[in-house]
Amino acid sequence: MNTISGMSSLTAIGMLTPVQSMTCLMILFVSTAMCLYSQGFVLMGMLYVTMYVGAMAMLFLFMLSLLKMEYTPQGTITPLMVTLLAMCLMPLDITYETYGMVTQMENVTDELVMVGNQLYTEYAMLLMLTGMMLMLSVMGAMSITK
């Protein structure tokens, strides 16, 4: 996971188009969420996927695909750069120890039930307000492009 995270973060910077950069950023967020999930931070891993990949990255991809941006090719990533990157990040991936994805399934369901109860009872109005803000931002992006 560390190698994938490192490669996707550097390719997000080096890509030529914004859509390709956002795709690499989504890969970075998913690999970070998987790393958090495997370390025992189940809730944080799921929130990473929900918040970053599910909402923000899709909104940016939608806006960038509608804006018809012009770009000029600046160059490519050389094979020497990829080799050096792999050599620097490989020791991190070799020393990474996995302890299993899910150790106790009861803890996972208890966390999810607790978060679901909190979101849909106590924070229901804030959740609806956030959904309205997301809908307004999508409508704003659509109106800008017309």
Swiss-Prot record:
Give the subcellular location: Mitochondrion membrane
* InterPro entries attached to this UniProt entry: NADH_UbQ/plastoQ_OxRdtase_su6, Nuo/plastoQ_OxRdtase_6_NuoJ
Out of the domains of life, which is the source?
A: Eukaryota
Q: Does the keyword Transport apply?
A: yes
The enzyme class is translocase
Q: What membrane topology term does the record carry?
A: Multi-pass membrane protein
The EC number(s) this enzyme carries: 7.1.1.2
Q: Which reaction does it catalyse?
A: a ubiquinone + NADH + 5 H(+)(in) = a ubiquinol + NAD(+) + 4 H(+)(out)
Its annotated function is as follows:
Core subunit of the mitochondrial membrane respiratory chain NADH dehydrogenase (Complex I) that is believed to belong to the minimal assembly required for catalysis. Complex I functions in the transfer of electrons from NADH to the respiratory chain. The immediate electron acceptor for the enzyme is believed to be ubiquinone.
Entry similarity comment:
Belongs to the complex I subunit 6 family.
Indicate what this protein is called per its UniProt record: NADH-ubiquinone oxidoreductase chain 6
The protein's organism comes out as Debaryomyces hansenii (strain ATCC 36239 / CBS 767 / BCRC 21394 / JCM 1990 / NBRC 0083 / IGC 2968) (Yeast)
